[in-house]
Amino acid sequence: MFHILLHEPEIPPNTGNLIRLCANTGCTLHLIEPLGFELGARALRRAGLDYHALAPVRTHASLTAALSAVAGGRLYVVETGGQRSYAQARFAPGDALLFGSETRGLPEAALVEARAAGAEQLVIPMRAGNRSVNLANAVSVVVYEAWRQNGFAGAAQAGLSRIPHAPDVP
C-alpha cells in the first residue's frame, strides 16, 4: 500500500506500534539507520505483539538507500514546518511518507535530500504552543487518511471501499 520511512527512530515502543500499524494496513516500514535501539529490543517486541511476522520491515544504511528503495511513488515529508495539511494531499498506493526522529525531527540535510528527490512537505495541524505529535500517532493519522482516500483497499471488512471521501479542503 504505502511506504513509511522513519529517519533514525529512537524509541522502541513507537517502532513496535508502527510494525503493528503496517500489519493492519498493508504498509511497509523502512527504518533508516542509525537506530536508537536494537531490533530485538524487548520493548519493541512487546509493542509489536505478534505482528512482526505480518509486516514487512526493511532497514537502510542511509536516507539515500531508503529513497532508492521506494522510488516510483510520490514522496511526502511530514514535519512541523510543512505549509500544507496532510488532509489536503491526495495519496496513491506506492507513495512514501518520511518522518523524522522523536526528539530531533528530520535534520536539515535529510530535508534537503528529500526535497531534491521531489518531496512535498506536509504538516499535521495542532494547537499553538505545542512542538509535535508523538511519532507513532503522527504516522497513524497520516496512514489512515491515505488509506481512507484509497477506499481502505485490502481491508477485511466488506463495504469499506464505499465510504465516501471527505470533500476537498481549500
List each model region and its residues:
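Post-transcriptional modification and biogenesis factors for structured RNAs
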Residues: M1-P170
